[in-house]
Regions:
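Intrinsic low-complexity, disordered N-terminal segments enriched in polar/charged/small residues
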Residues: 24-26
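Intrinsically disordered/low-complexity terminal segments and short unstructured peptides
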Residues: 4, 16, 400-401
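Leucine-biased recognition of intrinsically disordered, low-complexity hydrophobic segments
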Residues: 3-4, 33
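Intrinsic disorder/low-complexity segments enriched in polar/small residues
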Residues: 7-10, 17, 42-44, 405-407
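Short hydrophobic alpha-helical segments enriched in small aliphatic residues
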Residues: 16, 29, 33-35
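Membrane-interfacial helix-loop segments of redox and metal-homeostasis proteins
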Residues: 44-409
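N-terminal leader/targeting segments
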Residues: 8-12, 28-30, 43-44, 49, ...
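Basic polycationic patches enriched in arginine
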Residues: 2, 10-12, 18, 39, ...
Length: 409
């Protein structure tokens, strides 16, 4: 007996459900019902002409993973445009000269991400029970060290990895080199020569049992999610930003639940399961690097589509705004600083379980204790490195009234 290919299984499924939905072949039935599996439950959904259109375009041949690449590209495109216009960056919100406004933008996005994600959970569309954020064995040591490294690295490179990806689309060659080195080091930490370090640090865990989420605390997800969202919005509304900036920041935040729901609900496929993912740059950067050099052997995934979309979106936005400009390094010392920061972020992002987006903007809305620890340690690492740089700059510039100029990112 020959085993059916995935495409044949999908075509047979659609054909059978169409027969079943047409009222057992009754020619008088004009309003079809299609039976599809959603979260392992069979639900009857009205379909009619939409089904015919879906089939006519040959979408029944499209796998869930292929569809996730398109979804990620669209989400990445939107993020690239919005992040370029708002200068969205966690580093700026910590140590930038305009950190009050930058933090207001970041917290607005976080608030909407929390509201949207928890609303999707409450609606039963998604849940994070099996997600790595909710693993009972939490590698606190790896997260702490990784967060500190990533935070320090993003200060050295004057931008978190999401910001640097956006800057790459605007012609910044410094950012492009950092993104490349970051991807190489992240991949080496995941699967290469630095993997033993990751495994060793990751083996030091604390068993949190069921207390891996704020949702398990008194008050539950509604109270804790609400507190985070309200506190974030309260600060954002007093941050001095123009309403337009906050609206764009809110749209960035809504991309997080859009990705969670897209991969965890809309594209849920019993025949072709995919991981539930959202905005993140660490693992996607490593995956994109590997796909770039071996695309004939491995298919693109959500992360590859996301990064491609971000780059294109940032490029288009910078061209429309006439802000595209080629930029490079000014001196070898500056190059060394950026490469060091890139390597630190590559190792740190993997150990921490994500970057400022993966662990922060996407992770915190899940109410995961591990994600919250990661973003707190990233912030601490960034503030510590900035303090060290300021002290060094003050010592080197003693007796001089001229402030050392640094490249504005």
């Amino acid at each position: 007996m020959r085993l059916l290919t995935q495409g044949e299984q999908r075509r047979r499924f659609f054909h059978q459900t169409r027969i079943n939905s047409a009222g057992a072949g009754d020619p008088n039935v004009s309003f079809h019902l299609i039976v599809i599996p959603i979260r392992s439950k069979w639900e009857i959904i009205p379909f009619s002409r939409i089904f015919a259109m879906f089939e006519s375009f040959g979408f029944e041949e499209t796998t869930a993973k292929e569809a996730s690449v398109l979804l990620a590209a669209l989400i990445g495109l939107a993020f690239g445009v919005l992040a370029q216009r708002t200068r969205f960056c966690f580093r700026r919100s910590l140590v930038g000269e305009d950190r009050r406004q930058a933090l207001g933008v970041w917290l607005t996005a976080l608030a909407l991400a929390v509201i949207g994600t928890q609303a999707a959970v409450a609606a039963g569309w998604i849940n994070f029970d099996a997600h790595r954020f909710m693993a009972s064995e939490v590698p606190f040591l790896a997260i702490a060290i990784g967060g500190l490294l990533f935070g320090a690295g993003m200060v050295l490179t004057r931008g978190c990895i999401s910001r640097l990806t956006v800057l790459t689309g605007g012609g910044n060659l410094r950012a492009a080199l950092v993104v490349l080195v970051f991807a190489v080091v992240a991949h080496a930490t995941l699967k290469g020569v630095l993997a033993p370090l990751r495994v060793a640090l990751g083996s030091v865990t604390v068993d949190m049992g069921e207390s891996v989420s704020l949702a398990t605390l008194p008050g539950g997800a509604l109270v804790w999610g609400g507190l985070i969202a309200v506190a974030a919005l309260a600060y954002a509304l007093r941050s001095g930003n123009r309403p337009g900036q906050l609206v764009m920041a809110a749209l960035i935040g809504l991309l997080v639940p859009a990705a969670w729901v897209g991969t965890g609900y809309i594209l849920l496929d019993e025949f072709d399961p995919i991981a539930m993912e959202s905005l993140s740059f660490t693992s996607p950067s490593a995956d994109t690097l590997f796909w770039t050099i071996a695309s004939s052997s491995i298919p693109a995934g959500f992360g590859t589509g996301l990064l491609g979309g971000v780059f294109v979106g940032a490029l288009v936005a910078s061209l429309i705004a006439r802000e595209f400009q080629w930029q490079s390094f000014d001196a070898p010392r500056q190059t060394g600083r950026y490469l060091t920061g890139a390597a630190m972020m590559g190792v740190g992002g993997v150990l921490a379980g994500g970057c400022t987006l993966g662990a922060g903007l996407s992770g915190v809305p899940t109410l995961s204790v591990a994600a919250i620890e990661a973003i707190v340690m990233i912030a601490l690492g960034g503030l510590t490195m900035q303090a060290l740089l300021s002290r060094s700059s003050a010592a080197n510039g003693a007796g001089s009234t001229t402030r050392q100029v640094q490249p504005a990112e």
